[in-house]
Amino acid sequence: MRRGGWRKRAGEGDGWGGWGGYMSAKVKKLEDQFRSDSAIQHQRDGNSSSIFSGVAIYVNGFTDPSADELRRLMMLHGGQYHVYYSRSKTTHIIATNLPNAKIKELKGEKVVRPEWIVESIKAGRLLSHIPYQLYTKQSSVQKGLSFNSICKPEDAMPGPSNIAKDLNRVNHIKQCEMESEITPNGISSWNEEEEEDSDGLGFTKLDQILPERKQNGIQSHKDSTAIFNGHTHNTCISALKTQDCLVPSSNSVASRFSPGPVQEEGKPEKGIVDFRDCTMQQLQQSNKNTDFSWNPHRTMSNSSSSSSLHSNTKINGAHHSTVQGPSSTKSTSVPTPSKAASLSVSKPSDCSFISDFYSRSRLHHISTWKCELTEFVNSLQRKNSGVFPGREKLKKWKAGRSALKTDTGNVSVASSAKPQSCIMHVDMDCFFVSVAIRNRPDLKGKPVAVTSNRGAGKAPLRPGANPQLEWQYYQNKLLNGKAEIRIPDKLDSLVWEHSDSAHMNGVDCDLTVLSMAEIASCSYEARQAGIKNGMFFGQAKKLCPNLQAVSYDFNAYKEVAQTVYEILASYTHNIEAVSCDEALVDITEILTETRLTPDELANAIRDEIKAQTKCTASVGMGSNILLARMATRKAKPDGQYHLKPEEVDDFIRGQLVTNLPGVGRSMESKLASLGIRTCGDLQCASMSKLQKEFGPKTGQMLYRFCRGLDDRPVRTEKERKSVSAEINYGIRFTQPKEAEAFLLSLSEEIQRRLEAAGMKGKRLTLKIMVRKAGAPVEPAKYGGHGICDNIARTVTLDHATDSAKVIGKETLNMFHTMKLNISDMRGVGIQVQQLVPISKTTSAQSAVQSGRLPGGSHSVIDLLHVQKAKKCSEEEHKEVFVAAMDLEISSDSRTCTVLPSRGTHLTAGLNSNVSKTDSAVKLNGLHSPISVKSRLNLSIEVPSASQLDKSVLEALPPDLREQVEQIYTIQQGETYGDSKREPINGCNTALLSQPVGTVLLQVPELQEPNANMGINVIALPAFSQVDPEVFAALPAELQAELKDAYDQRQKQPEQQPANAFVSKNPCLQLKHATTKNKKKIRKKNPVSPVKKIQSPLKNKLLGSPAKNMPAASGSPQKLIDGFLKQEGAAAQLEAVPSTSDASDPSALQTEQCGSFRPQAPNLAGAVEFNDVKTLLKEWITTISDPMEEDILQVVKYCTDLIEEKDLEKLDLVVKYMKRLMQSSVESVWNMAFDFILDNVQVVLQQTYGSTLKVI
């Protein structure tokens, strides 16, 4: 059919208006849609501009930002976005790469990079597109004419262009200067007239361009030029160019702009990490007569009268006391350069430096208090007597009130109903400030901040410091994401040195900067003035001149925190210590027992906290942790809010996504690009879309959290993963010896912390912060680290240690390999990981190191003989199966099965002196690298408790000992009356399946030692199987004995042929199953072995003769396959001929037994499919509104089926639920099914790479 034929046949009256009418209508529809979306976008963002008025773009190919983001930007700033290219209407083509054919086709068109749009928005006006052209005819050696473009006054938009008129770009970008002088460092100067013409529009009105960028309200600087270390330079610093530095900062970005504040001191309250809280407003000052200034260190008070030093005096002389008015009796000061030499400051080389630093570090105190409070809660739970004084008071109060209401016949129905699960979130209001002013009535109701500086907020500019360039570096780093910004080395001598000049362009400058002492906490009155936690004190003083500063009082903070937790502990011990001023409490049990409402309980707790501490607390309550935390936001300050289940949907829809845990700046930006700003918007996105954008786990988390679903429990105990000590404040070394001495001192600090935690560590990490090449020698913050590179080295020790000598030695070795410039070191840290409790290793290690092993033996051979004498004479050998499975298939990557000997009877008894908390990884001196903490699955079959030697059990390493004790605990619940499960030869016939890659390890019975040899050499394992950690822990004489034994065995001739190795050689041996056998087994057994064991349908067929034929081959893989075929077949095994040889395969088959059978997947106890169907039908038909706990239980049952590879039953269950739930009249059941199905599909996708087809 020729082109256009169908159109002619359609006729002119079809509504399209002739040829091309369809596309014209489509394009018009897209334009109308763009205009309508623009209006919606303007209402949502709250601002707009006309920067791109008259500009119509067409995006060709992949761009960064994406086409959707560029479309959104054009909506906001007055441009047009064309889905289809039009030569007559499209003004600019946006692309990052084009093929040669496209280049020729678009010859003469304006093809520019997407940076043109982004940087035009940053500049606040339409920039010239020429520097951003994707391709140009100008050769690389051809020079261009540097004419300055002329901008009309009406082109300038309110925004950064009125402050820094234009910024030089690396690629010779020529922009409008508007008579402003471009300084060498790229920051434009401006005069008083220009600012008056702009009607005072500066950084304070940047929110007109980006509405969500909250500003602190500082007026722009007037009548000054930017100080470049006090003097001018002739070289433009391209690595730290500033055209991106003047972008309006959001609240989150602004709170993190600091050119390297101290990590331990420079964070806001409750330990929130804010390393770069240097906002753009800190580049300005409201007074036009004040020169551009920064504060790289603490300031000195103008008052000359000084008082005694406060207990919180900071190291390096950064915190001194002077009298400063009635509201601040102490002040932080930093000496001027002329006085610095005369002041005694603490140095890292001083022996008391580390202790002084941590004694005055706020964040160190906060983290330490959290550990102490967590241990306090744990100790209460261990010593729980069941008596709660607070709860008893509530009962009495409730009884009295009920008696009064009974007289009037007005009993509360809500209090008599059984409450559902309820979590309470207790958060103190402005904790540091509240504690500081509780005895200061003169400060109540006034703007107050807790900080180390109480002066005027200014300090002298130190030589060598360059705050502007540090600010530019952090600004660019945040704006460009993780992109590394290169700082040329050659700038060292040109830019960073020679800061003695106090002139710039011939103008004298006041070398004072704003104080960079950070505010740890501020009152709500101060927050109303724009001050926030983490802001620099100098900037805060500009915002609020009446701001009153108070000093730290760590003893008072600790006292109040302990009081708060004691109050909570008087009601319940189900407490999770979040911080010194924050806690999560499970109050379900309290509400059930006292019959109070959540509001009544919260009110009682808040009143008691206020009465005892004189500080207020806010309380949020909800059915889970997420809702409780969100309710607290609404309750603050000094209030309480109970988010009821029926209010959750309406409440959470209006919440910003930034209020959800785990959503930071990066994720917020990505969600915004998808048009998602609130939880209501997020609910419209499917789980598949979220998982595609953010990954399976994060996508599922967002999907659940935006609906108010959170199954995280209140955790009272948290396993400690590491112990560390890091310092990045005041670190300055001049000689290698100083650094080495400091590392040794830090190792001693690590030892103290390990001993306090009762831990030993096996993995050491050394972290060093080194000044970045080209960065200022002196950072903007006094004593801070500045712009640095982070270097780390890690080593794994042979055995866990808490010795400062061992840690120091290994640390020095790693330090020497780094080959660093000592003078550039700015931070040092040591971290210890792979922790093991000291109490769990002391008994075994002390016995080994002293040469006295359990049972009074003095060597490994004696230990083995002692064990043999204590066991039954029928015991002939042990076998250990270590099965390794690919880690990519499952996290349960290894399975270790220890089979008991012949004649060992399994019982359910467990000796009372066996501790549940112990763990181990060794067996009779044989080391296994498998650790419970690495989440490996260990299944161990052990002898009965009556046959167990206590001394041997105590000598076992912690991980293996814990596994043995866990199996004994499981055996307590098992019964052995069933004849089908009667032990054979003292062994239970159940055996876990052995996965691919099985290795057979024989531990034969020890022969009597040969008198001529003096030691049984054959009983030793192969030298390659000896664990270095075990060997290193032996005493010196025992090591020598073992070395002699190995040397002696090497001299003995081989007496056994290779083919008789299995049956006659009693030495330890490893046999690997062949790939051929694996393939055959897989073909014969398409059903998973695990499912074969655990399926309840298969349990009835265990006695079938067809399934109990003995294995005819002696190979390990066939032997294991034979075990799987003979579960419970006692009669068949009796008919199998066996030899007297202990290593004969048929004889071994009678001993392959297990005492542990994992529980089959069940739904509330229902295992069979018919039972599950009945339970599901009853659940769906009798309940109109399903509970979250029930839905999660169904999800767990389905995921258990996936783990058991019972996909057939899973398919039936899902389809049955779909029929029932979709036939229900209640729409909530449809939502419940979608939620269940989404979770099941996620697990299936992760496990099998595919999903379930539900029709």
UniProtKB/Swiss-Prot annotation:
Gene3D superfamilies: 3.30.70.270, 3.40.1170.60, 5' to 3' exonuclease, C-terminal subdomain (1.10.150.20), 6.10.250.1490, 6.10.250.1630, BRCT domain (3.40.50.10190), DNA polymerase, Y-family, little finger domain (3.30.1490.100), DNA repair protein Rev1, C-terminal domain (1.20.58.1280)
Record-annotated UmuC domain positions: 423-664
Transmembrane residue ranges: none
Stretches with biased composition (Polar residues): 287-300, 313-325, 1137-1153
Region feature (Protein interaction domain): 1156-1255
Region Disordered, residue ranges: 287-348, 1073-1114, 1134-1153
Motif (Nuclear localization signal) on chain: 1079-1085
Compositional bias annotation for Basic residues: 1073-1085
Entry EC no(s): 2.7.7.-
Domain (BRCT) ranges: 47-134
Binding site residues for Mg(2+) 1: 427, 581-582
Residues engaged in binding Mg(2+): 427, 581
Function: Deoxycytidyl transferase involved in DNA repair. Transfers a dCMP residue from dCTP to the 3'-end of a DNA primer in a template-dependent reaction. May assist in the first step in the bypass of abasic lesions by the insertion of a nucleotide opposite the lesion. Required for normal induction of mutations by physical and chemical agents. May play a role in homologous recombination and immunoglobulin gene conversion.
UniProt family annotation: Belongs to the DNA polymerase type-Y family.
Domain notes: The C-terminal domain is necessary for protein interactions.
Name this polypeptide is given: DNA repair protein REV1
Lineage, broadest ranks: Eukaryota, Metazoa, Chordata, Craniata, Vertebrata
